[in-house]
Amino acid sequence: MDSVVFYMKVNVGSGNPVKVRATENVLGLIYGNVEVRGVEVESGVPDQPVGLEETVRGAVNRARRAFRDCELSVGIESGLHRVPETITGFVDLQWCAIYDGEHITLGVSAGFEYPPMVVEEVLAGREVGDVMDELTGVDELGRKRGAVSFLSGGLLDRTGNTEQCVLMAMIPRMNPSLYGLK
């Protein structure tokens, strides 16, 4: 008897290997056999989002725009968010939007604060990635271990941080009856 192998096709609205790997890691644990591929799409927000609305909109746009020939699409967007009582006034959070053609579910990662000089440069119009590349001497740090790895002394890398937001966005899908999903 021939066995049928089921696998889920998932598109990630980015060519960033960290975002693709994090999505594959989390959805592989949940669904087993997944095919995850990166699809370059426009976020529709500035390259360096600032604020909740802009960052979430970027993640949602990426998820919706990547939805083609797949069961789920994923959009991940990192941005600075105003947070009182922090040294710089800002915390970096990654938002994940997961789209199934009907519903969007959202999740967010643990946040961390960039050094003041990084935030100052970003607020002056530069991208975090460019500033962190200069600070660390690592080209395309955000496509590798990430700023969070550098700043945490390697205790958490960008893949792990990104996995957090993907998993949080999956919670309603893992409990569909509790969230009114099909």
Swiss-Prot record:
Mg(2+) binds at E42, D69. GO terms for biological process: nucleotide metabolic process; thiamine metabolic process. Its cofactor is Mg(2+); Mn(2+). The keyword Protein biosynthesis does not apply. It holds the Pfam family NTPase_I-T. It is an enzyme of class 3 (hydrolase). It catalyses: XTP + H2O = XDP + phosphate + H(+); ITP + H2O = IDP + phosphate + H(+). It comes from the Archaea. One of its GO terms (molecular function) is metal ion binding. HAMAP family: Non_canon_purine_NTPase_YjjX. This is Probable inosine/xanthosine triphosphatase. It comes from Methanothermobacter thermautotrophicus (strain ATCC 29096 / DSM 1053 / JCM 10044 / NBRC 100330 / Delta H) (Methanobacterium thermoautotrophicum). The lineage of its organism: Archaea, Methanobacteriati, Methanobacteriota, Methanomada group, Methanobacteria.
